[in-house]
UniProtKB/Swiss-Prot annotation:
The gene is tig. GO terms for cellular component: cytoplasm. This is Trigger factor. It comes from the Bacteria. The keyword Cytoplasm applies. It comes from Bacillus licheniformis (strain ATCC 14580 / DSM 13 / JCM 2505 / CCUG 7422 / NBRC 12200 / NCIMB 9375 / NCTC 10341 / NRRL NRS-1264 / Gibson 46). Residues 163-248 form the PPIase FKBP-type domain. Keywords: Cell cycle, Cell division, Chaperone, Cytoplasm, Isomerase, Rotamase. GO terms for biological process: 'de novo' cotranslational protein folding; cell division; chaperone-mediated protein folding; protein transport; protein unfolding. It is an enzyme of class 5 (isomerase). The keyword Isomerase applies. Its EC number is 5.2.1.8.
Length: 424
């Protein structure tokens, strides 16, 4: 095999590959073995037609496409490795010369990973956020725990207040006409939760059980149902029941109820403080790392191919869909409720996709510039962590992953981020 790489404008280039005749003839042999199984010629059983008769009847050219299908997936990656390039998209293959007994010549128009010109990435002067936890932070967290343990108790007397839960019937009208999805009976709504259209919940405050009221609101301009967006509406409301939150006492019994590992409120308070400190530390670390990466990427220069952005957008869409599925939703439902379509969502994600791609390219360039290497021991350590996380033997993890090349690249990028933190 001979390989020639010609760089063209931007990140494009042409790879010219010449495959020796013996290799091409072997591919023709394999192609014939595949094709002949489907060929019937009078006097011969299917699959038993002699090669010479096949070529006489159909021509050797009938085998060329199958031979290419066998050959290209093997020879193209070899050529890429020999040329030392990193394609980021499927190649455009053009066969220049194909003839039995001769060398095969094909070209591949390729988009490659861009070169990155690093700017400042050391001494970026970004500081880590303060991670101190105050007594107020701890008390607020305990109050949140208290709120989550609250019971709803029916108010026999009194009016609706912020934070109360009301059980109500409602029916909405636009231009005097009821609309689909605008009616419910015995619906439980926490007043002040922001669950309903802006202005709806505020108008319930002060009402008593049994009260009826016309609640006037205007649907937001960006409301998911286009036929309602921006329109004024009237909801006929009837309050059946008002429930107030009854908070448990903050005492030792409360502490034991929310955490069986503690015996007193003092122990719960101390444990809560440590948990908040750990959370703040992790949050500050993550923010610092993100800001350093973004700044280093901002200082770098790279002509990013659209193919890389498109690939990242597809990855982000899959991640988004997985998050929706965890919430019991899918893309179709999301588009229905949001009023968006796939193109609009991708356009919304585009800037983040570009930042992700440039950040990753920058980190790879930093790893190369600083000669950051990943050892076999570090790979084994990472595999062990994965095995522990998934509760599987390390060998099973290795089989599932196959090649560890991708893992090595990920670890190298992680080392580049560590380098930015240490040299900020």
């Amino acid at each position: 095999m001979s390989v020639k790489w010609e760089k063209q404008e931007g990140n494009e280039g042409v790879l010219t590959v010449e495959v020796d005749a013996d290799t091409f003839n072997k591919a023709l042999d394999d192609a014939f073995k595949k094709v002949v199984k489907q060929v019937s010629i009078p006097g011969f059983r299917k699959g038993k037609v002699p090669r010479g008769l096949f070529e006489q009847r159909f021509g050797v050219e009938a085998l060329y496409q199958d031979a290419l299908d066998i050959l290209l997936p093997v020879e193209y990656p070899k050529a890429v490795e020999e040329a030392g390039i990193e394609p980021v998209d499927r190649p455009e293959i053009d066969v220049e010369k194909i003839e039995k007994g001769e060398n095969l010549i094909f070209t591949a128009k390729v988009t490659v990973k861009p070169e990155v010109k690093l700017g400042e990435y050391k001494g970026l002067g970004i500081e880590k956020d303060d991670t101190a936890v105050t007594d107020e932070d701890v008390q607020n967290e305990l109050k949140s725990l208290q709120e989550r343990q609250a019971e709803l108790v029916v108010k026999e007397d009194g009016k609706v207040e912020e934070g109360d839960t009301v059980v109500l019937d409602f029916e909405g009208f636009v231009d005097g006409e009821a609309f689909e999805g605008g009616k419910a009976e015995n619906y439980s709504l926490e007043v002040g939760s922001g669950s309903f259209i802006p202005g709806f919940e505020d108008q319930l405050v002060g009402l008593e059980a049994g009260a009826e009221k016309d609640v006037e609101v205007t649907f937001p301009e960006e409301y998911h149902a286009e036929e309602l967006a921006g329109k004024p509406a009237v909801f006929k409301v009837k309050i059946h029941e008002i429930k107030a939150k009854e908070l448990p006492e903050l005492d030792d019994e409360f502490a034991k109820d929310v955490d069986e590992e503690v015996g007193t409120l003092a122990e719960l308070t101390e444990k809560t403080k440590k948990r908040l400190e750990e959370a703040k530390e992790n949050e500050a670390d993550a923010k610092l790392r993100e800001e350093l990466v973004l700044k280093a990427a901002e200082n770098a220069e790279a002509d990013i191919p659209q193919a890389m952005i498109d690939t990242e957008l597809d990855r982000m869409m899959k991640e988004f869909e997985q998050r929706l599925q965890m919430q019991g939703m899918n893309l179709e439902l999301y588009f229905q409720f949001s009023g968006q379509d796939e193109n609009a969502l991708k356009e919304q994600m585009k800037e983040d996709a570009e930042k992700r791609v440039k950040s990753n390219l920058t980190l790879e360039a930093i790893a190369k510039a600083e000669n950051l290497q990943v050892t076999d021991e570090e790979v084994e350590e990472e595999l062990s962590k994965m095995a522990e996380a998934y509760n599987m033997p390390v060998e099973n993890i290795k089989q599932a992953i196959g090649s560890t090349d991708g893992m090595k690249e990920d670890l190298k990028v992680r080392k580049a981020i560590d380098f930015l933190v240490e040299n900020r």
